[in-house]
A protein has these predicted regions:
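Conserved catalytic or regulatory cores that recognize and/or transform ribose-phosphate-containing ligands
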Residues: 1-149
């Protein structure tokens, strides 16, 4: 199974360790195409470990990520930190009819976007612990594999 994991990069890296934990756990279910999102050394400037010292340009990142999004079997996003890029990816994922799960934590003053919570193509789920997030992801992956989603 090819998994596309989405999480904030340029909008902030406060949740990078959460992404890393989720991605490490998701590897037991298949290939995580975007595992760099969980790299704690990845800065808000982007994935500079690729291509050249200053990092790949925006067009390269866009085209690479769109190829991964097209190739994936499902999308899992951690959307607690709002991100324009993640929103773009989720919009395309729904157009491509990919199964999409968005996980988020409740943080005062930062409600889930109505465009995520109200989308019929997106399953959104609140979690308060990593164990709960893993249970939600496992159920989503199993239902996707069984063709229920």
């Amino acid at each position: 199974m090819k998994i596309y994991f989405a999480g904030s990069i340029r909008a902030g890296r406060d949740d990078a360790t959460i992404y890393e934990t989720m991605i490490t756990w998701l590897r037991s279910y298949g290939e995580v195409l975007t595992e760099h999102v969980g790299n704690p050394l990845l800065s808000a400037a982007g994935d500079g470990h690729l291509k050249v010292a200053c990092g790949p340009d925006n067009r390269y990142i866009h085209d690479r990520d769109m190829a991964w999004l097209t190739a994936c079997d499902l999308v899992i996003a951690e959307v607690t930190t709002p991100s324009l890029g993640v929103g773009y990816e989720l919009g395309w994922a729904t157009v491509l009819e990919k199964p999409v799960l968005c996980l988020y934590r409740i943080i005062a003053g930062r409600p889930l976007s109505a465009m995520i919570g109200g989308s019929p193509g997106i399953q959104a789920a609140e979690y308060s612990s990593m164990d709960e997030a893993k249970r939600i992801m496992e159920e989503f992956i199993k239902k996707t594999a069984e063709g229920i989603i």
